[in-house]
Amino acid sequence: MNKALPKAIFLMGPTASGKTNLAIELRKRFPVELISVDSALIYKGMDIGTAKPNAEELLQAPHRLIDILEPTESYSAADFRRDALKEMDDIVAQGKIPLLVGGTMLYYKALLEGLSPLPAADADIRAQIEQEAEQFGWEAMHDQLKSIDPVSAERIHPNDPQRLSRALEVFRISGKTLTELTQIKGDALPYEVHQFAIAPKERAEIHRRIELRFANMMEEGFEAEARALYERDDLHADLPSIRCVGYRQMWDYFDGEGTLDEAVFRGICATRQLAKRQITWLRSWKELTWLDSDDIDGALELISTQLEKK
């Protein structure tokens, strides 16, 4: 008889949907340990603008894979999968259930489905692409991608140079499109995964929460936190850490683009767009149970019922 797979919980959702609060409540009721699934929370010194769980919350529910890198460093979906699997194995060895909580959908996908055999980054080719973009513009580079890989071009916005550059880089290195290569799957996750997504029923409520969160961040000193990063000699606007929503807009403000109020407004708009993309991705997710962030007791009951199923 096959040995039963260990359980794991995915707690997904758009930004500002209440994932952290629900995760803390889950830890009070179930033998779970938390793993952060967030491409911004990995960075040290980026606490306020990422809405990182505060000291009290981390005391109640420690999160693994938070504060593991300097903002100068990069971190891929492959890096996350490697680290998350290690943490999950450690949690299971303690007789507990891994609870993965966050909103970086690409990380969840990589963990659940395995990774496609994409080529490693090539600094020379990346530099060549960036040089072409500087000469012709990212719109022209997007047109180039459209002629090679229309499926990826449909998904990638011309104003997303990181993903656009990567799609072109993959083709130039391998001779195959990103679409072709991502259809080849890696190893599936060896866990019995219970997948949940938490969000308010009304989109307007997400917008309200985002605005409130941004206002709170500014009161807590986000401008000073972002400026401290801006004044470091080892950081620049093209790093993944500084491209995080909120930080990118503050960086532009420090560079002289507009007023502080305008930077805050742009940050709110960018966060709304992020939430919209997260929800769109989740709507296409398979085997997902939706939870109402305005009914935490109901959410806990639903999760409890699912975990008790064999």
From Swiss-Prot:
The record marks T104, R126 as: Interaction with substrate tRNA. InterPro entries: Dimethylallyltransferase, IPT, P-loop_NTPase. Substrate binds at T15, A16, S17, G18, K19, T20. Signal peptide: none annotated. It catalyses: adenosine(37) in tRNA + dimethylallyl diphosphate = N(6)-dimethylallyladenosine(37) in tRNA + diphosphate. Keywords: ATP-binding, Magnesium, Nucleotide-binding, Transferase, tRNA processing. Its EC number is 2.5.1.75. Residues 38-41, 162-166, 243-248, 276-283 are annotated as: Interaction with substrate tRNA. GO terms for molecular function: ATP binding; tRNA dimethylallyltransferase activity. It comes from the Bacteria. ATP binds at G13, P14, T15, A16, S17, G18, K19, T20. One of its GO terms (biological process) is tRNA modification. Its cofactor is Mg(2+). It is an enzyme of class 2 (transferase). It holds the Pfam family IPPT. Catalyzes the transfer of a dimethylallyl group onto the adenine at position 37 in tRNAs that read codons beginning with uridine, leading to the formation of N6-(dimethylallyl)adenosine (i(6)A). Belongs to the IPP transferase family. NCBIfam families: miaA. Monomer. This is tRNA dimethylallyltransferase. It comes from Aliivibrio fischeri (strain MJ11).
